[in-house]
């Protein structure tokens, strides 16, 4: 119950940030299209800093074992969910934005502040294991469907700053190299902006929408149901039958972090990619806002279910 209350407080805080982005557009300070610049800053600067900073922890056998559990769980969950959601997409005639919004969680923007707030900074590494796996899917599968490209450009994928940051972070961790304090502090400070910056982008986009149309669109609620209820319940079942929460003394907490990453609202990165690659960013933003609003209730409930059944 304690974790659920802390989680609810953190989600409300992030929702207030969305409201701030909404207000600065409605007040005429900026335009909703100005958010595209901030989206690029999040995608190509802030997220890489988050990843590198997360891997700047002490190398121990316990940490390595926990990291391997987190990576394995993240890969298994995301592959199984990709298969299930792709099948649902065909069955329910979902478009690219809907499929991406159901599949991709907002772990990149929420898991760091949420885990830091409810468990402590030392546990963030395991959340970043999920983020790293999801980033690979984001810059392959998600980029392909959102940009409507017919094939993968592997050179661009490999040379993407997010992919490079994952490699740098992993290499630094396993070689036990710590960056100079000044550089590490700078990277950490930039990375800490991820939650506010992403939420402000969402709020700015939301301000440019016809709110009556947003809330009258039944598809938004259908996508929200899939993202916030069905996907978490499927994930909970997968975690239960895999027995991965019992692989070590810390495994239950590690799997809780992975579960938290899965049950977050639809990814702000989908909105940002829609902006960058010319898809329906306003629809993606509407889904993001509605799922974030629902998360105030659904995420604490899902955590209670996890604590009860895992």
Feature map (PLM): residue ranges:
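Alpha-helical transmembrane segments of multi-pass small-molecule/ion transporters
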Residues: 1-310
